[in-house]
Amino acid sequence: MNSRTFDVVVIGGGAAGLMAAMRAGQRGRRVLLLDHAEKVGKKILISGGGRCNFTNTGAAPERFISANPHFCKSALARYTQHDFIALVDKHGIAWHEKTLGQLFCDGSARQIVAMELTMNS
């Protein structure tokens, strides 16, 4: 049996799990991503009618309800929707804005999943 060492194990290959794994990989961590589905990002592939509503330009801490209001402020300050848009642009993924700041891929949600998986390797 092969023995491999990982710095981070992420359980769940949905949007949040892929993002967590991607960010850890960007920071030089060796990441193992586990999911029960046969393919990670399966729900992302059907989101937004297959085009992935990948962020919203109107995301702001005051629009979230939380028992700890500082959590949203801190989380959104560390990685903003503009950071993700820049990443999408860097990977050459064309996108457009729909109603109320919703951003969608011009092509397929597969582009977002592929980008996140590439960032982990």
What are these regions (language model features)?
Residues R78-S121:
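Feature captures the FAD/FMN-dependent oxidoreductase FAD-binding
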Residues T5-L33:
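N-terminal Rossmann-like FAD-binding beta1-loop-alpha1 element of flavoenzymes
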Residues G13-L18, K42, G49-R51, I93, ...:
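Gly/Ser/Thr-rich helix-start
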Residues A37-H70:
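Conserved N-terminal glycine-rich FAD pyrophosphate-binding loop of Rossmann-like flavoproteins
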Residues F64-S66, A75-Y79:
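Glycine-rich phosphate/pyrophosphate-binding loop regions near the starts of catalytic domains
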Residues V8-G13, A37, K43-I46, E97:
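Short glycine- and Lys/Arg-enriched binding-loop motifs that mark or flank ligand-binding interfaces
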